[in-house]
Amino acid sequence: MMIIVSSIIAVLMAVAVMVVRIKSSDKPVSPKKIILPPIFMSTGALMFLFPVFWVTGAEFLEAFTLGVIFSIFLIKTSKFEIKNNEIYMKRSKAFVFILVGLLVIRIVMKSILSTSIDYGALSGMFWILAFGMIVPWRIAMYLSYRKLHNELQSSNIQMN
């Protein structure tokens, strides 16, 4: 039952991310908007204060490594563009498909792993996977943003 509930919540969160992503492409990006999500998500690590969520070293490495691998797809579909002297996220149709694909993979993995791994530890592993995915993605976004921001600044200086 918990697997079904958590899968429904994951679907709702994915839909929310897609809506936010589409709406945010209409507004300029700032470093704060890139950096804050992983910081906010890091508070979820407090779950590991409770033994029910503890994972082994191998489970941690597996989950984190898989998250880093998944982040590559997000990094490849997150591009910026300059419009009206401001930096915006480019809309990407591939991003939606990748997000849905990652969600399907997550649900399938959770269904399979829930038969052999305790639900609390599995929840911890999926948090680690998500954190391992969002941190490299946001670091890559920030570096890309800084590069574009510096180009924008130097072109503004040359114009003056």
Swiss-Prot record:
GO terms for cellular component: plasma membrane. Its main location: membrane. Coiled coil: none annotated. The chain crosses the membrane at residues 2-22, 34-54, 55-75, 94-114, 117-137. The lineage of its organism: Bacteria, Bacillati, Bacillota, Bacilli, Bacillales. It is found in: Cell membrane. It is a multi-pass membrane protein. It comes from the Bacteria. The gene is ccdC. Keywords: Cell membrane, Membrane, Transmembrane, Transmembrane helix. PANTHER family: PROTEIN CCDC. The keyword Transmembrane helix applies. This is Protein CcdC. The keyword Transmembrane helix applies.
